[in-house]
Design a protein with these regions (language model features):
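Alpha-helical substrate-recognition element adjacent to the catalytic core
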Residues: 1-85, 170
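Mg2+-dependent phosphoryl-transfer enzymes with acidic/Ser/Thr/Gly-rich catalytic loops
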Residues: 29-33, 69-71, 75-77, 84-170
Length: 170
């Protein structure tokens, strides 16, 4: 799979990519997820530079919608049993060629979407079958700034343009 000249969008799995993949519940059954500020800042920088983002999650959690709202991501697909179909929908909705989309996932249920994307990426702690299929493996684990690292790697390779010299709003 050869990377496109320019990545115009990044689609992300949530659990295991933007979070550490753990499930945390409070004493009254409330759910918690921990997101890393490096990822929040990377997404903010990317959005300010014109990069589109989507969240594609197998889980149906209101926390995913809340995170998306916080960082300004409008394309959110939760409860996905077919992440490849969600990726196709995201690309069509935004008039994107799939070759201009990067997908980052961490487990075997992400492989279908990864096969469609122009660039497939995974955090360091992804499942071995995923690590064998991707173009980019970050040194950071999911939930520890892996998305920010991916954005920085793509920018350094000339695959996207990110502005780092002005403050970003998160």
């Amino acid at each position: 799979m050869s990377p496109p000249t320019q990545v115009r969008a990044i689609a992300l799995d949530v659990d295991g990519v933007l979070t550490d993949g753990g499930f945390w519940w409070g004493p009254n059954g409330e759910e918690f997820k921990r997101f890393h500020f490096l990822d929040v800042m990377g997404i903010a920088r990317g959005r300010r530079s014109g990069l589109l983002f989507a969240l594609i999650s197998g889980e149906d959690s209101p926390l995913v919608d809340r995170f998306a709202k916080k960082v300004g991501i409008e394309d959110v697909y939760t409860g996905c049993k077919d992440k490849a179909a969600a990726l196709r929908t995201f690309a069509a909705r935004n008039a994107l060629e799939l070759s201009a989309v990067c997908f980052m996932g961490d487990d075997v249920n992400d492989l279908g979407a990864m096969a469609l994307a122009g660039v497939a990426a995974a955090p360091a702690n992804a499942h071995q079958k995923v690590l064998e299929q991707v173009t980019i493996v970050t040194t950071r684990s999911g939930g520890s700034g892996a998305v920010r690292e991916l954005i920085d790697v793509l920018a350094a390779a000339g695959r996207l343009t990110i502005s780092y010299d002005s403050p970003a709003r998160s």
